[in-house]
């Protein structure tokens, strides 16, 4: 019944008292039932029946009304009411109250917030929301500069980041230079080379099975672009493929350098930023540049920009431009503190960057907190996730005045206000007692934040998917297109009605298939003109969608959407029916 609370939770009616002889009704003032007239008629019939039973001596007059309708239930209902409640048909139930989609937390697995003792947070792209496309444009331009420094033609400097091109969940084929969108079973949905979307026939020439096999993924032929930090990387790689093939006269080859050579050649990230160069042993002879080599150079340049501090320095120089600041953030953390929850920060960022970003976002809002550090019970920077969740690293204490590290002997507990660097999950659990389902960890990185913490240690999790806001907006705008697609799929099913093994002439559905394709293309184009929706392609779920369903207990566009729920809330997941079950209650949705 928790969903019957409206968006302001349980504080909305504080000024309205309910007389002791009146109990609030389940539906009164909370939702309007389209079947209200039917309920009134039903109650009249029930009261008439009860009166007849009394007149016949079959029922005690002390209780004329023994069958409760939906409008009669208290909020929450009593045991007597539930025992005497008469069910409505599923089709007659009024719509379940749901929060506005843009403010909702979506549920894959049940979580009771009042059983969560520890709330943990990542920083980058979770607490620190980077303003798009400004941040991606900055990263894109800085990686371009690195590539020019190591010998790429200066003509690439004219390339610009296109926020309408990249999406997460793509597979980059190192051998052929293609970007692939695949479904949850590994089937190729879309193939893009440079900025050109390839036809199915052309795609099948490269991938005869039209699948990405697990063996090919295991041998690292495909690189999964799964984080928000990889958006500029995906765009730049595609732009370089186009530019180098069409304009610079360089010949990109499909040949892959010898694996032993690749193992023996030092990565660019091992070199100082002032002496970055291309190791010629790692490139094709006769001046050819392979797609694999191009990927390695782009990947390494991206790592350099992130690891040498240059990108972070630019962000810190103009925090309002690159990072969101909202007063809701300290409000949310104050509510966690008031609720006696333990709160920890677990980030891979170093202290100097974490301190300046968190100070910018949280300091100065609440006089009860002198520093952003006061909102947290434990602060760990330089965590080196996902390694933190396995063997970990040596834990050190950070001198918050100088930023220097010192070896510390943490025996009994982490001290509030202090900042620690590195460590491991085993040590964290030993010192805090935070284990398993009592921990809710909130992050944006499916692998480093979600999969490792969940599969290895049973932490509950909330995945932040900022793209969800755009997806929901497009879904709302394209309702008519979606309904038309559903109609076409229904028509296709009807064409085969009654056909069995005696039927020998297949129906001609070429025209219908073309309409289905055109409608599906229109819908995909509304999300992203190259790759479509992050979660769907028509009725097919994407690989990214599969990961979200499999590993994320909860997911939302912004962690601050938790402000729309009381901290005792019970998130209930939909019961997902098998195909043979779905027809029974196809219109009955009990999601949050």
UniProtKB/Swiss-Prot annotation:
Do you know which Gene3D superfamilies this protein is assigned to? HAD superfamily/HAD-like
UniProt remark on cofactor binding: Binds 1 Mg(2+) ion per subunit.
Compositional bias of kind Low complexity: 1-15
UniProt-annotated binding residues for ATP = 226, 547, 550
- Gene Ontology MF: a single term: ATP binding
Per the entry, which co-factors are needed? Mg(2+)
Renumbered to this chain, region (Disordered) spans 1-37, 252-273
What's its catalytic activity?
A: a ribonucleoside 5'-phosphate + H2O = a ribonucleoside + phosphate; a 2'-deoxyribonucleoside + a ribonucleoside 5'-phosphate = a ribonucleoside + a 2'-deoxyribonucleoside 5'-phosphate
Into which family does the record put it? Belongs to the 5'(3')-deoxyribonucleotidase family.
The protein's name: Cytosolic purine 5'-nucleotidase
Task: Cite the source lineage.
Answer: Eukaryota, Amoebozoa, Evosea, Eumycetozoa, Dictyostelia
Gene, per the UniProt record: nt5c2
């Amino acid at each position: 019944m928790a969903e019957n609370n409206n968006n302001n939770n349980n504080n909305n009616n504080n000024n309205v008292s309910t007389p002791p002889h009146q109990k609030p009704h389940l539906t009164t003032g909370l939702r309007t039932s389209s079947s209200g007239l039917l309920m009134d008629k039903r109650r009249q019939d029930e009261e008439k029946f009860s009166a007849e039973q009394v007149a016949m001596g079959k029922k005690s007059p002390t209780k004329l009304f023994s069958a409760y309708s939906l409008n009669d239930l208290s909020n929450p209902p009593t045991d007597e009411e539930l025992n005497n409640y008469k069910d409505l048909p599923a089709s007659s139930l009024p719509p379940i109250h749901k929060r506005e989609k843009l403010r909702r937390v979506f549920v894959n697995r049940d979580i009771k917030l009042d059983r969560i003792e520890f709330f943990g947070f990542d920083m980058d792209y979770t607490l620190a929301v980077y303003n798009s496309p400004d941040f991606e444009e900055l990263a894109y331009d800085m990686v371009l500069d690195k590539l020019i420094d190591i010998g790429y033609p200066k003509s690439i400097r004219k390339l610009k980041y296109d926020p309408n091109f990249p999406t997460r969940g793509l597979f980059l084929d190192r051998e052929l230079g293609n970007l692939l969108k695949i479904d949850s079973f590994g089937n190729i949905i879309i193939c893009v080379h440079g900025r050109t979307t390839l036809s199915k026939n052309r795609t099948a020439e490269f991938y005869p099975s039209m699948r990405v096999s697990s063996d090919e993924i295991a041998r690292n032929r495909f690189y999964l672009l799964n984080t928000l930090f990889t958006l500029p990387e995906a765009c730049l790689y595609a732009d370089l493929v186009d530019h180098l093939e069409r304009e610079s006269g360089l010949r990109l080859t499909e040949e892959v350098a010898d694996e032993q050579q690749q193992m023996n050649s030092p990565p660019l990230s091992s070199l100082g930023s002032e002496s970055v160069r291309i190791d010629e042993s790692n490139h094709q002879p006769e001046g050819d540049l392979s797609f694999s080599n191009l990927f390695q150079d782009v990947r390494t340049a991206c790592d350099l920009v992130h690891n040498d501090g240059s990108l972070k320095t630019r962000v810190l120089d103009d925090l309002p431009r690159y990072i969101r600041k909202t007063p809701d953030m300290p409000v949310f953390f104050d509510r966690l503190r008031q609720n006696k929850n333990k709160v920890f920060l677990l980030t891979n960022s170093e202290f100097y960057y974490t301190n300046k970003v968190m100070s910018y976002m949280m300091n100065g809002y609440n006089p009860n907190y002198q520093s952003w550090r006061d909102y947290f019970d434990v602060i760990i920077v330089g965590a080196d996730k996902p390694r933190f969740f396995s063997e970990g690293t040596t834990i050190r204490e950070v001198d918050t005045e100088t930023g220097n590290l010192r070896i510390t002997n943490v025996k009994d507990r982490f001290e509030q206000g202090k900042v620690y660097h590195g460590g491991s999950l085993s040590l964290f659990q030993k010192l805090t007692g935070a284990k398993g389902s009592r921990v809710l960890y909130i992050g944006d990185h499916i692998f480093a934040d979600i999969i490792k913490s969940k599969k290895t240690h049973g932490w509950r999790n909330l995945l932040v998917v900022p793209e969800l806001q755009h997806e929901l907006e497009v879904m709302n705008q394209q309702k008519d297109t979606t309904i038309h697609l559903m109609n076409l799929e229904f028509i296709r099913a009807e064409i085969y009605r009654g056909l069995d093994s005696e039927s020998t002439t297949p129906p001609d559905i070429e025209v219908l298939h073309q309409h289905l394709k055109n409608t599906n293309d229109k819908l995909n184009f509304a999300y992203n003109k190259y790759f479509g929706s992050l979660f769907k392609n028509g009725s097919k779920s994407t690989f990214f969608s599969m990961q979200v369903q499999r590993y994320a207990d909860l997911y939302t566009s912004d962690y601050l959407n938790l402000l729309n729920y009381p901290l005792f809330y019970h998130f209930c997941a939909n019961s997902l029916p098998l195909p043979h079950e779905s027809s029974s209650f196809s219109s009955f949705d009990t999601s949050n």
